[in-house]
Amino acid sequence: GSEMCIRDRARRIRKCIPFLEYGDSHQRSEVKMCIFAAMNENILPIHFAPLQGYTDAVYRRAHARIFGGIETYYSPFVRMEHGEIRRKDARDIEPDNNPDLHLIPQLIAPDADKLEHIMSLFIEKGYQEADINLGCPFPMLARRHNGCGMLPYPEEVKALLSEAIDRHPDIRFSVKLRLGWEQAEECLALLPLFNELPLAHIILHPRLGKQQYKGEVDLEGFEAFYKECTHPLFYNGDLHTANDIRSITTRFPRLAGIVIGRGLLANPALALEYKQGTPISSDEMAKKVGQLHTEVFNAYQELLQGGEAQLLMKMKSFWEYLLPDGDRKARKTIHKTSKLANYQSAVSNLLGTY
């Protein structure tokens, strides 16, 4: 085993060498870290964080097939609306819509009754895992004690989690949370409760809910939680390069894994690059993104009933985070155009010049 491991590291280092000689300065610094990593690193599993409106079943299927490198995908949270589960949420977690990938469905609920309603759907669909969202920072939901808005109320968190675990001893529950809604200490006040409960893992994004995605991540706040947490802990937040991942795993060596959302939407190859220890070339990236785009476009064309306008709107969101360093003029056209033909030619230009 150790001999194979050494051979694998040597192979990864050999793959890096040409980039040191011919790569630009960004590639060279990435590669130096990759070589260091290949010699020292314990590669952690990468999980794909859910983003409402972006990482639906269509996107997940295409990403898993074309890029891969992801151990687990999470569905955007399933929630109750007007007393019932939103139909599109139920469709999104259908096992038939998520073949050949490991999906953990996520839910958001302000109380045990609503949670129970959603859990019955998960169980009906055959899921044995569920992620409970205590991290969503959107004020409309948070004000009603959903997601991150529940963190200042330890009794409510306790009632929600204890009830779920008592009613479903066979389900492996995980929790995704932030440091707090208003104060970073909110998560620390909950830590004795978390440590007591039989959770599969915890995902922590080291920001406050009221920050949304603004400002810096608070690594000291993360560290305070990390030191006392007895469950497998996953880090989430502001990871855009393989270097970013490595600096976090070096600082927090006991992490069980890494969860990435926006960083993977911007660079869908990020998990792959981290795992193989080499960046993929611009040509390879353009080719793979082209395949991803074609697959997602064709799937939406078949699914959506609202004609060209609806399809265009959906595809514009596909580009919101993707390839931020791509041609600016082409990106502008993609977001401004109201014609499908102009959109398609702007996509070709963007990929052709990448």
Regions found by a protein language model. Give the residues of each.
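Active-site-adjacent beta->alpha loops and helix N-cap segments on the catalytic face
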Residues: G83-D89, P139-S162, Q211-E223, A269
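Hydrophobic faces of well-ordered beta-strands that scaffold small-molecule active sites
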Residues: I46-A49, Y73-S75, L103-L107, A130, ...
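Alpha/beta enzyme core
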Residues: S120-A130, L134, P139, L160-Q211, ...
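Active-site beta-loop-alpha junctions enriched in small/polar residues
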Residues: L51-G53, V78-M80, I108-P110, G135-P137, ...
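Alpha/beta catalytic cores of nucleotide-metabolism and tRNA/nucleoside-modifying enzymes
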Residues: M39-N42, I46-H47, V58, A159, ...
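Glycine-rich, positively charged N-terminal anion/phosphate-binding segment
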Residues: N40, L51-L121
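Short, small-residue-biased leader/transition segments that mark boundaries at the very start
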Residues: G1-I6, Y22
